[in-house]
Amino acid sequence: MENENKPNVANFEAAVAVKDYEKACSELLLILSQLDSNFGGIQEIEFEYPVQLQDLEQEKIVYFCTRMATAITTLFSDPVLEISDLGVQRFLVYQRWLALIFASSPFVNADHILQTYNREPNRKNSLEIHLDSSKSSLIKFCILYLPESNVNLNLDVMWNISPELCASLCFALQSPRFIGTSTAFNKRATILQWFPRHLDQLKNLNNIPSAISHDVYMHCSYDTSVNKHDVKRALNHVIRRHIESEYGWKDRYVAHIGYRNNKPVMVVLLEHFHSAHSIYRTHSTSMIAAREHFYLIGLGSPSVDQAGQEVFDEFHLVAGDNMKQKLEFIRSVCESNGAAIFYMPSIGMDMTTIFASNTRLAPIQAIALGHPATTHSDFIEYVIVEDDYVGSEACFSETLLRLPKDALPYVPSALAPEKVDYLLRENPEVVNIGIASTTMKLNPYFLEALKAIRDRAKVKVHFHFALGQSNGITHPYVERFIKSYLGDSATAHPHSPYHQYLRILHNCDMMVNPFPFGNTNGIIDMVTLGLVGVCKTGAEVHEHIDEGLFKRLGLPEWLIANTVDEYVERAVRLAENHQERLELRRYIIENNGLNTLFTGDPRPMGQVFLEKLNAFLKEN
């Protein structure tokens, strides 16, 4: 009995075979839900595989994906299959895992299934699918129109037929954590230009997969267009209308300022905030220092550990079984304490912060750049940022509170090695180039640049991708993408524990940083290992942060590129000139540049918030 509700591939296949489609869909959703919980891993999903694959993890994953894709093909090719309005929402929340099942199998996409929906035998273009007029066909089309699809889609036509279904598909297509291939990347880029003005027409979130709203909000940052964050403004408007109409939301009356221990109150809403997470390492010191002027109340999830909780004068778990209850809890804390400041060190990784950013909870509301981008919210006045991380203020809807560059000193990672045996190779036959990157930061432009580096360098190079989030069924797809540009000149290492990840980079001679979304922790890891590399700067903070860090570390400015051509040229120079590269590495090692990131004066944030509060009180 205990295995009955466990995800099981054979159970799914059996239900498909006997055309018990209700059971088949339930079994499929169970498998997709488990993949979601596992971040793509296939553990806890029961399926038999040939014993020959026992120790071949990647081949086992491809085998799993191929079996799943074959059964899904049979299921969705049958015209008898009907998916309800509720069913399509459930499938679209998990569409990214359907996409990976096909992308990591030989099928690549589900276009062969979409072709069975075509009702126009005399079409001129096989990539044009002419559906019948039933809603059922449109629903099935939306579920299987995946990021890798080559089929033509007219969003205007779909919007005219069903705005909510079209919006739901746009949500799903922006939700994957890897949108790196030119097909997938261009699809998202098109949506980011088309979608904002249409999304803004929706009255509420009721008939769209709002559970993946934070993916829409956050993943737009990995695009390359200047207006890529506009989708946030539209999403914010829909969220605001939703909480007013569906929750009966009323903003807090913020004229009353309360005091605890004779200090005004700052309420801090947290996302990922524990001692092993980068947000804790980058933003805890400034909050501790702010307690000189404010009584700090932290609000977060059970993942906030003891170290995270101790940053605050008091800490509360956010109570509530749903978003309405969570928002009401946050408002009650702000109300009962007369919060003067409502502050979020990061926003975009969790639904609660995004919803809260569309409410008025305190007279002064601010974020920091734990996820480095604007909110486009009508309710956030300020962004806390170190001065040297700013590229262009025009990237923000908020007013920037620009702090000195040492005002947010980092806390060293608890996992950082105590001692490093530096690997300094004098004249390597092959220059190993390390790339620390999550899957979200990979894109065709970055890979084209790496290909140009390989082709132009007079020395042989090999790229080692130390990948974050490339787990389970994600990895074969990511690896194929990397190999499609770099072939045997690259090794794609799947997501690995921190020490193993450092070992991959330790064996490299230099590094290059991804763009347009650069690195913070990757640069810290680079310098920890006595490595140097090249970065590309730009207008957005998530581009410019690399430049700021390189300059703080005392690296020469020629390693900071303004254009892709400069990036390629400088990476080639660093790869070819062994002596110059080793001198730079020795400089970094001997001067312990990393120490500059861990030292500084964390007091300015609290001071500038106090100034803003005093100005507010004077005016009111």
UniProtKB/Swiss-Prot annotation:
- Cite the EC number: 2.4.1.-
Which enzyme class? transferase
Keyword Cytoplasm applies = yes
A GO cellular component entry from the record: cytoplasm
User: Superkingdom of the source?
Assistant: Bacteria
Q: Which GO terms describe its molecular function?
A: UDP-glucosyltransferase activity
Q: Which Gene3D superfamilies match?
A: 3.40.50.11380, Glycogen Phosphorylase B
Indicate where this protein is primarily found.
cytoplasm
Keyword match Amino-acid biosynthesis: no
State where the protein is found.
Cytoplasm
Task: Output the GO biological process annotations, alphabetical, semicolon-separated.
Answer: protein N-linked glycosylation via asparagine
Q: Describe how the cofactor binds.
A: Does not require a metal cofactor.
Q: Which pathway, per its entry?
A: Protein modification; protein glycosylation
Catalytic activity from the UniProt record: L-asparaginyl-[protein] + UDP-alpha-D-glucose = N(4)-(beta-D-glucosyl)-L-asparaginyl-[protein] + UDP + H(+)
Keywords in UniProt for this one? Cytoplasm, Glycosyltransferase, Transferase
User: Function of this protein?
Assistant: Inverting glycosyltransferase that catalyzes the transfer of one glucose moiety from UDP-glucose to an asparagine residue in peptides and proteins containing the NX(S/T) motif, resulting in their modification with a beta-linked 1,N-glucose. Likely acts as a key component of a general protein glycosylation system. Also accepts UDP-galactose as a substrate donor, albeit with low efficiency. Cannot use UDP-GlcNAc or UDP-GalNAc as substrate donor.
- Report the sequence similarity comment from the record: Belongs to the glycosyltransferase 41 family.
Listed name of the protein:
UDP-glucose:protein N-beta-glucosyltransferase
Q: What is the lineage of its organism?
A: Bacteria, Pseudomonadati, Pseudomonadota, Gammaproteobacteria, Pasteurellales
